Amino acid sequence: MKKSITTLDLNLLLCLQLLMQERSVTKAAKRMNVTPSAVSKSLAKLRAWFDDPLFVNSPLGLSPTPLMVSMEQNLAEWMQMSNLLLDKPHHQTPRGLKFELAAESPLMMIMLNALSKRIYQRYPQATIKLRNWDYDSLDAITRGEVDIGFSGRESHPRSRELLSSLPLAIDYEVLFSDVPCVWLRKDHPALHETWNLDTFLRYPHISICWEQSDTWALDNVLQELGRERTIAMSLPEFEQSLFMAAQPDNLLLATAPRYCQYYNQLHQLPLVALPLPFDESQQKKLEVPFTLLWHKRNSHNPKIVWLRETIKNLYASMA
């Protein structure tokens, strides 16, 4: 027999959404400002209503059942529409509005000043919180700690960072694609040699530790060729690798996205860019789609929609 929503306490749906986000009774209780016991009682009521366990315990926390997974997007959309209704009287002039972004650096630094100006023009009382993109950023989006992420993914078939590998709860839009190139100081001895794979591998390299990994698609392509680069230094950010490659008498090579030319121009780094010495099919595996990422529950959030369009317009020249 079909159940009527009039017999369901709608507060239970908020509890259900937070349990899906947090995968923890304790964390959901903290966000609701109630005790874990109260959340457990709410979960028991939800299980009775849906006649399904909804979540089972696992080593990583609460694991959703197939029914719960199938309801996630509908639940998020329902909660989003509820929030829009509640915001109607005052959302035109929000106070205390906060924009929380996680972005690859220096990608965001290129346009941060322009982006902040547009935000403050529209929302004068807003605050902006920017964090570096790292291994936890996708989970932070899922947890609701980040509104939008802006980062590069990978194209190599064996990569863990493919767009097709993103969690089902994450929506995305590719703003532009980039092929990395090799950055070296203007008086580097490699510039006096024939630029080929042997020259590229003859010199020591700076690697970027990306989402807890020191290797990426470049190393996969080299492995397919039976070759390997010498990694002399591992750094967390592209701008650090560019800074080190630009130092006098430094033989280090940095491999970084082509868009870094904008960053280099801003900071007047004495660097030259050379193409990676690979054929077209190998270059294709190294393409980096730079992508906006957000949770599906925010797909119709006016603040997030406006922010997505603003970032998209700012980076249109790089497409």
Curated annotation (Swiss-Prot):
InterPro entries the UniProt entry points to: LysR-type_TF, LysR_subst-bd, Tscrpt_reg_HTH_LysR, Tscrpt_reg_YidZ, WH-like_DNA-bd_sf, WH_DNA-bd_sf, YidZ_PBP2
Keyword DNA-binding: yes
One Pfam family recorded for the sequence: LysR_substrate
DNA-binding region extent: 25-44
Record's keyword terms, sorted: DNA-binding, Transcription, Transcription regulation
Matches recorded under HAMAP family: HTH_type_YidZ (MF_01607)
Function: Involved in anaerobic NO protection.
Family: Belongs to the LysR transcriptional regulatory family.
Name used for this protein in its record: HTH-type transcriptional regulator YidZ
Source organism of this protein record: Escherichia coli O139:H28 (strain E24377A / ETEC)
Lineage, uppermost ranks: Bacteria, Pseudomonadati, Pseudomonadota, Gammaproteobacteria, Enterobacterales
